[in-house]
């Protein structure tokens, strides 16, 4: 039985640090909180944590040598549909996990500068501390789903409830107040079967606009603060879209398994697809992509529609340069599960500042 309640709050422990001098924030602020996840007081399993799902896939017999440094390439927060565990990777190994038990799917995950982990699990959004305490929880109503969230400062979260109709919402986690609620267009407002595939990602940009990939309606729409459409780009099955620092938009087309960078004038300025990869490196369901500060793009390859025994043959992520050179292949089914998304913790920027991270 799924336990449902609209809001549940817990009061986190607040630790104040006093600085003797003011200065610019660190280039990669999340690196300073990673030690909390391996502290002696962190339990192996949190009181509200779900049981880990058994790994029922076989380990690949022989993994060829791949470009890059494997798990040591980036410290990252990693999650994927089909295996409900969030992995924290640091110094080339998994150092912390959070499992949600069976049911639903994890599609979006964030580490905040206070060390908290914010994530969606199809029927709820949750925030947990490195010490595995749940400090905020929001269950969506029956018949709706949630696949995307974004921190807006430390006290607010943007999410989209797939439903009839779907709704973009901004919730104040401290007060429980719904500060923004706006219905979005949908292919149907009466057919429950259309709820699940409506949205997988929506992001607020640095300018306060909303970038919405309509997965079923084959378009990406940017809305201003009053929800007036100001830019539209048509593309099959856009799973995710992110506004880049250069003003372009990076879009993931799940149907055609490609990632495309589009200018404000809707001109394609860069594209990466399966044909750009060397033999033996095969992408499956591309769902998300992230542009790194060094200009590289990381593309995640999920396992949707595959059998368990096929999973170990699927590449989980690749990192490519602007000129399409392959510099990293993530292929590690011994330590990780399927890949939908990851947040790279060595990237500059503040996660709860919209637009700081290109993800």
State what each model feature region is:
Residues 9-19:
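Bacterial N-terminal signal peptides
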Residues 1-11:
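Bacterial N-terminal signal peptides that target proteins for export
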